[in-house]
Design a protein with these regions (language model features):
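Non-ligating segments of multi-cofactor redox enzymes
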Residues: 1-191
Length: 191
């Protein structure tokens, strides 16, 4: 084998090792009760128990190797979190801290992500219709979203939102006028 072949094998082996190392990723939405990035990846053993008990199948695991291989994430556009907290009850390592499924505890302790509203796509904000589905499905009510003006346009309050994604899942706009982004991503708010 020549020098180039040896270097290629070494680079591939190193990439494989790095792909399996727990690396913090703040770019994905984690299930409720998730420890902070870094601590979560070190604690999670990828046992799939959280995904198995998720009634909506919102908890997914990425395939293959890479930064988030073996660590659960939420696919809220496809299925929202109904805040049942079953995932936090079955986590054997504490990567998902137990949170009782009591509304006041959920409101105080769960921060999956923050809402971002694209007013250019929202039916109520563009004047193309009165929708308001996001407000009707929100379990946090006016703490997280209120309806304003004659078009009953949604106005989101990140501090009152738990990031469950029910609004994102319910949005009838093809491009989804509302989406939940990871907390601390610096993109919460309006566009």
């Amino acid at each position: 084998m020549n020098r180039r072949g040896v270097l290629g094998l070494a680079a591939g082996a190193l990439a494989g090792l790095l792909g399996r190392r727990p690396v913090a990723s703040a770019a994905v939405l984690r299930p409720p009760g998730a420890l902070p990035p870094g601590a979560f990846e070190r604690a999670c053993i990828g046992c799939f128990r959280c995904a198995e008990v998720c009634p909506t199948r919102a908890i997914r695991f990425p395939g293959g190797a890479g930064l988030d291989a073996g660590h659960p994430f939420l696919a809220l556009r496809e299925a929202a979190c109904v805040l049942c907290m079953a995932c936090t009850e079955v986590c054997p390592t504490g990567a998902l801290a137990p949170i009782p499924a009591q509304p006041e505890r959920v409101a105080a302790e769960v921060r999956i992500g923050v809402p971002v509203l694209d007013r250019r796509s929202c039916l109520s904000w563009t004047g193309e219709g009165v929708c308001s589905l996001c407000a009707y499905v929100c379990p946090m009510g006016s703490r997280a979203v209120e309806l304003v003006g004659p078009q009953q346009a949604p106005l989101f309050h990140a501090e009152g939102c738990v990031g469950c994604g029910l609004c994102e899942e319910a949005c009838p706009v093809e491009a989804h006028a509302i989406r939940i982004v990871p907390t601390g991503s610096g993109t919460g708010g309006l566009t």
